[in-house]
Regions:
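Conserved RNase H-like, two-metal-ion catalytic cores of nucleic-acid enzymes
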Residues: 9-97
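Metal-dependent phosphoesterase core characteristic of DEDDh/y 3'-5' exonuclease domains
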Residues: 28, 68-162
Length: 163
């Protein structure tokens, strides 16, 4: 079980956030959940805000399959990629089956943040997050917004993606 803050002698040394990203042709979102405070933090096409948030000292970020996808697309965001470059990076990984760290925008860069991948802790690496959620009787909520929509999302579409 993932606990929130990592402590040493009662002193907090790392705060843990679980995160996920969603990428569209002209929009990207990063959603963080502070597992101690139960607070959600959302960034939408805000490279500077995202960088200010993620590069603070003492933070650790976790996700599911993030070491192969989310971490590297987030690296593009942190290093100033526009939404269209972020989408190209996304498609490089998903459609072309490329390694996220080999995408030209981030190639040869050191990852700027510390993270762990929850998928590393399961025996069957073929299990999807949806299968795990189903096994736990958790609701599986998917956005109705097409990831290949070729325009900026409307306000209501953005809200659906976030929640």
């Amino acid at each position: 079980m993932v606990k929130g803050a990592i402590k040493n002698a009662g002193r907090v040394i790392m705060n843990v956030y679980i995160y996920d990203i969603e990428v569209f042709a002209h929009d990207w979102f990063v959603v963080f959940s502070d597992i101690d405070e139960k607070e959600i933090t959302v960034f939408h096409n805000d490279n500077v805000g995202l960088k200010r948030f993620m590069l603070r000292q003492g933070l650790l970020f976790g996700g599911f399959n993030n070491k192969h996808y989310d971490d590297w697309v987030t690296q593009s965001m942190l290093t100033g990629a526009d939404p269209e470059t972020v989408k190209t990076h996304n498609d490089f990984i998903i459609m072309q089956k490329g390694n996220g760290w080999e995408f030209p925008f981030v190639q040869y860069q050191k990852k700027l943040f510390k993270s762990f991948d929850l998928r590393d802790d399961i025996a069957d690496k073929g299990l999807s997050l949806k299968a795990i959620e189903g096994n736990l009787c958790q609701p599986i909520v998917e956005s109705s917004i097409d990831f290949n929509i070729n325009r900026k999302l409307t306000k209501s579409e953005a809200e659906e993606v976030i929640f």
